[in-house]
Swiss-Prot record:
One of its GO terms (biological process) is proton motive force-driven mitochondrial ATP synthesis. GO terms for cellular component: matrix side of mitochondrial inner membrane; mitochondrion; proton-transporting ATP synthase complex. SUPFAM superfamilies: ATP synthase (F1-ATPase), gamma subunit. Belongs to the ATPase gamma chain family. GO terms for molecular function: proton-transporting ATP synthase activity, rotational mechanism. InterPro entries: ATP_synth_F1_ATPase_gsu (IPR035968), ATP_synth_F1_gsu (IPR000131), ATP_synth_F1_gsu_CS (IPR023632). The keyword Plastid does not apply. Keywords: ATP synthesis, CF(1), Hydrogen ion transport, Ion transport, Membrane, Mitochondrion, Mitochondrion inner membrane, Transit peptide, Transport. The gene is atp3. The lineage of its organism: Eukaryota, Fungi, Dikarya, Ascomycota, Taphrinomycotina. It is found in: Mitochondrion; Mitochondrion inner membrane. Pfam families: ATP-synt. It comes from Schizosaccharomyces pombe (strain 972 / ATCC 24843) (Fission yeast). This is ATP synthase subunit gamma, mitochondrial.
Amino acid sequence: MLRQTLTQASRMRPCISVVGFRGFHASSPCEATLKEIEQRLKSIKNIEKITKTIKTVAQTKLTRAQRAMEASNKYYRVSDEVFKEAGTKAPEEGKTLMVACSSDKGLCGGIHSSISRLIRRELHDPKTFENTSLCILGEKVRTQLLRFCPESFYLTFAHIGGASPSFEEALQISSNILEHAKDYDRIVLVYNKFASAVSFETVMKNLYTTKAINESPNLSAYEVSDEVHQPLMEFAFANAIFSAMAEAHCSEMSSRRNAMENASKSAGDMINKFSIQYNRQRQASITNELIDIVTGANSLA
């Protein structure tokens, strides 16, 4: 297994875990003291602050990611139109290299598991499993698939997803992939396509190879010399990787914002429940103390 790591490192975001409270049940108020409930409330409020902050950051990044995605898609559509007009057909059979586009970041719902599920579904067929190798962009999908098909791994890339992807980053990735993909008949790209602010679609896209470009029936209309075919394919491949990374990054930011919004709402609901329980417990404690005082005063009278 060959592991390729990009030199462009991303800023790492702290990981947050919501830990359950052992020995405490909200349905049994008598089991918890006022101090315990107060500690739980404080912890949940801190988590709520963190989730709201992550949501705000994700919302800001989503706006920038959408602009970057729209720009990359316009550029890719113009590039892809050339091959469509030339009648280029991407290969659909043969030894396959499947490129999964994800990232190293979590706290974004099912954005990574959806890619893993699609790949597992494709590799469920024994013939496909035998003829397919994996190239993974990002640690999340790599970790998920490592338990399922470690023998299928061929290339992995880390430090993906820190900021909006650049064409330079996509070019580094595509160059490394093409350098080690000479023995493959087809290359398939798996990524999350941005649909709206609340949804995404996991898709597979067949990419053009040098052989497919050489066999294009109408390519001669562009008067392209044969020695340009290979650089043209490399540019088209880098363009496709860049567009997919921009789509995946935008989908990730949207999913993270939605996940943190749901987490903030859940934290708010828990705060309300524990606040009610705290007030009831405190009221019961005060009532019991008043009863003890009145009872003691009556016994002395």
